[in-house]
Amino acid sequence: MLAMALIESAIERGGLVARGAFALDEADRRAGLSGVEAIVLVGAAGARGWSAFAASPEARDGRPHPLDRWSRRVIGALATALGARALYPFEGPPYPPFQRWAMRAEPVHVSPLGLLIHPEYGLWHSYRGALAFAEPIAVPVIARRASPCEACSARPCLSACPVGAFGEDGYDVAACAAHLRKAAGRACMDGGCLARRACPVGASQAHRPAQASFHMRAFLSARGAPG
């Protein structure tokens, strides 16, 4: 049985963060993961994971999708070294259910913005891939916690967006993107989503300007607009 500490160490050497693990059941295997015993999620948390990408060739070569290409290279190499299969949230359709996997692997919950909220990192974390193992691993027991959003009556995240893109009906992607394309959207483009930044949980983990701006430009680029 593979030790989780060995897997975590390998992921950290690759510049990323181990984001929890879970053992699969028969329903998972029937859903297309036959032969897989356990999954370890790989991603970023706060600033952890950013510096390795920012120093990579992919970040500077000017080609599309640099973060996805870097994730594929790094996580693919980890999979080869650890005898696992690499899975990615951006490969599909069908796309692997990374949000559901995350809620099995870590004490995260769906926030009012639709993003998963972590008790330490707040909304400042992501999942870049997963390692699927054909043999069992020693999956850590998760200390389950209530969502921090349950005790937040003010919910500043829902009122901070300049164009009200977040509400009871969900996320108005078109309104958000249209705002970012205008001069009035520079605060979001340069410093990151204002609704996300309004959340007090994990505020110290918020992306610094270079990281925030990269992700906002990538968001616009995915919607056919230059960042």
Where do the language-model regions lie?
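Non-ligating segments of multi-cofactor redox enzymes
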Residues: 1-227
